[in-house]
Amino acid sequence: MVNEKTSTDQLVRRFIEDLGVTYEEQGSSNIQIKQALRSASKSKSQSGVGKPEFIFFSGNHLIIVEDKLAIDKLEYKNNDGIIDTEFPFRRDYAVNGAVHYARHIIEKTNSYKEVIAIGIAGDGLHYQIHPYFVSETELKKLPEMKSLEDISPENIEEFYKVAVLGELPKEERELREVNKIAADMHEDLRNYGQLEGEKKATVVSAILLALEEPTFSLNQLIGSDRVGGTDGEIIFNAVRVYLENAGIVPYAKVGEMLDQFIFIQRDVTLNTVNSNLEMTPLKYFATTLEAEIMDKIKSNTDFDILGNFYGEFVKYGGNDGNPLGIVLTPRHITSLMAELIGINKSDFVLDPACGTGAFLISAMNRMLGQAENDDERRDIKQNRLYGIEIQQKLFTIATTNMILRGDGKSNLIRDNCLTFDNTIMNGYGINKILMNPPYSQAKNDQTQHLSELSFIQQALEMLVVGGKLCAIVPQSTMVGKNRHDKARKKQILKQHTLETVITLNKDTFHGVGVNPCIVIFKAGIKHPENKRVSFVNFEDDGHVVRKHVGLVGDGTEKGKREHLLAVLAGDEDDGTDLIVKTAIKDTDEWLHSFYYFNDGIPSEDDFYKTVANYLTFQFDMTANGKGYLFEGVEENE
């Protein structure tokens, strides 16, 4: 019979060894801790020596781990919802025992006044990890984990700041800094430039490109009203010279972009010295962007700064603000998707609906991280990243984005990917596609060709045989309940292979009302009848919604992401509540919830959560034009 020493202990031991730290079992060689444990037994009398199952340091943080084989022995809370460390609970429950030892060490030592106490219960397939922060005055439940990766020496300080102190994650701090600049710039563009709508983003793009031109200087902007000498004309000419010397092909693309910037030359408000600023609004904007944004854009980060500027601008109304039209994909999702299909420095990557270029930026960042010399870096930037975008305003932003990051070259095409000649992309040898198809456009028979599945089907034809496509779409896309969706699902499986579908956190697009999933296909190979497809429930991804802030990491997001990737790679195991591998039919709902069967007795909380999930799903389907599926149910029963 499997016992704790050969199952749960081994699981925990592997987790700790993966951290690369020195650990001890059943005690500590640290003099202070050893002394404190002398009277810390979990027995009723507490007269014996306390023997924590695992104890180690990560950085300067003391970690204590207790484990149990049975998941129902993970933790016990009294009627007040408090972890009870009285006997027998400290003996019988993992969390209670770990907290018991932590409190003893805090009380009996001078050096250790904070401890992270962790309870782990279960085995290699079904386990739970509950960490708690223990101090002299506080017992704080921390976010649940899937491994101990988040408390590794490399991650522990960030985890402590986010999970214990309640600070924002590093990425969110960067995002808020940029969004604050964008919000201020929005106000300035409106107040000083009298600009609305898409013109704000166009002005920002033009200035950033002008700042790249070696012959341009802010000192040239003197507020002249002479023909040919206005600040707007100087900026426009700098952009023209820069683009004409950047080797952009086809050359017509230069003309398209310059057409967007023409108004800057003679706009009276932009080119007139403002008495409050003591310069023209254009010079003021250019000075701000050079000082606060330019270095960030060129810092080889996967952060789509221009995209976030655009998102901040369109937040304030107008047609651009349609929440289901243009949806900016969060940074942690673009980078995850690039990793899911293993994008590497030798790939040719396409986003056929590239928007502001966020996916291409993530792909570039990942590829540059693998490059070994300047030639490889130049090759990646100039020859291996492609995009298609139909909307001129987004095309201008995306092109600016890629030019600023790509040594002056951009392989973007302004066209409709649904009607684009696939053979052109086939000629480039595209073997990886990342995409977020336009949402919610197929409302009736006349517009069914605009569905997400239609975009995916067309994109798959642009890949070489064996190429990978990774798309983020509403979960309703995978259901296929109308005749158009059914037909497309059937057609896709005749020519391509479905590999993975990942159900995401419902708040991924917080405030938009879309329940998303990630889908991965292999192109050009008919789906084998008995192939087992991976269906994953990744709703618990370590991101939560904070009031007045939005979606942020809770400190466990990195570990949960690494665990997901390890499970999909076959390097780690998990239960069917996370992943189900099964053969499929085109008539199935391609979602984890369709194939997953939970034979456990649901708790009251589980019941309410399931009902809430169903209502959310119904809303999502209705928002995507599939509300008819819920009509007349009683008549059909």
Swiss-Prot record:
DNA restriction requires S-adenosyl-L-methionine and Mg(2+), and is inhibited by S-adenosyl-homocysteine. SAM may be a cofactor for DNA restriction. One of its GO terms (biological process) is DNA restriction-modification system. It comes from the Bacteria. GO terms for molecular function: DNA binding; endonuclease activity; N-methyltransferase activity; site-specific DNA-methyltransferase (adenine-specific) activity. Keywords: DNA-binding, Endonuclease, Hydrolase, Magnesium, Methyltransferase, Multifunctional enzyme, Nuclease, Restriction system, S-adenosyl-L-methionine, Transferase. CDD domains: AdoMet_MTases. Its EC number is 3.1.21.4, 2.1.1.72. It catalyses: Endonucleolytic cleavage of DNA to give specific double-stranded fragments with terminal 5'-phosphates; a 2'-deoxyadenosine in DNA + S-adenosyl-L-methionine = an N(6)-methyl-2'-deoxyadenosine in DNA + S-adenosyl-L-homocysteine + H(+). Its cofactor is Mg(2+). Heterotrimer of two A and one B subunit. Both subunits are necessary for DNA-binding, which is sequence non-specific. A B, G, H and S subtype restriction enzyme that recognizes the double-stranded sequence 5'-CGAN(6)TGC-3' and cleaves bilaterally and symmetrically 10 base pairs upstream and 12 base pairs downstream of the sequence to release a 34-base pair fragment. Methylation of the recognition sequence occurs on the adenine in either one or both strands; seems to methylate restricted DNA. This subunit has no methylation or DNA restriction activity on its own. This is Type II restriction enzyme and methyltransferase RM.BcgI. It comes from Heyndrickxia coagulans.
